[in-house]
Amino acid sequence: MNSAPPSRAHQAAQRRGKVAEGLAALWLRLKGYGILAKGLKSGRGSGAGEVDLVARRGDLVAFVEVKSRATLDQAIESLTPFQRQRIERAAAAFLARRPELASCGVRFDMVLVAPWRLPRHIPDAWRID
C-alpha cells in the first residue's frame, strides 16, 4: 500500500520544525551545552519514542523538546502528555545504550521558538510521573 506524498503544508511545517531545532541547538550551545543527538528516534509502533535534542552540560543530560508556534505561550501549551511519554521512552532507550552517562543527572527541557523572539529555554519543563 502506497501512502500519498506529504502535502505542501506538511512539508513547510517540517522545514519550520527543522529550522526551529537548529535555532534551539545553537541557543543551547551558546549556554554551554554540547549536543549529543538530534532527531533521536527509538523503536517502532506504540513503543516508539522520539526527542528533538539531547544536550549535555557537565554531569547533566537534558532531553529537549523544541516547539515552534506563532507565540511562546502557544508553544508551551502545545506539548501533550502523549508527546511527553514518547520523549521519556526515547530518553530511556538512549541512556540504556550509553552506559557512560549512567552517573549523569537527567532532565526534560523545552526550547520554545516564535517569530521575531529569542528562543526561550525552559529547564526541567516536566518530570516523569
Swiss-Prot record:
Listed InterPro entries: Restrct_endonuc-II-like, tRNA_endonuc-like_dom_sf, UPF0102_YraN-like
Disulfide bond annotation, renumbered to this chain: none
Gene3D superfamilies assigned to the protein according to its UniProt record, in alphabetical order: 3.40.1350.10
Domain of life: Bacteria
Record-level Gene Ontology MF annotations: nucleic acid binding
UniProt family annotation: Belongs to the UPF0102 family.
PANTHER family xref list: UPF0102 PROTEIN YRAN
Full protein name: UPF0102 protein amb4503
Organism: Paramagnetospirillum magneticum (strain ATCC 700264 / AMB-1)
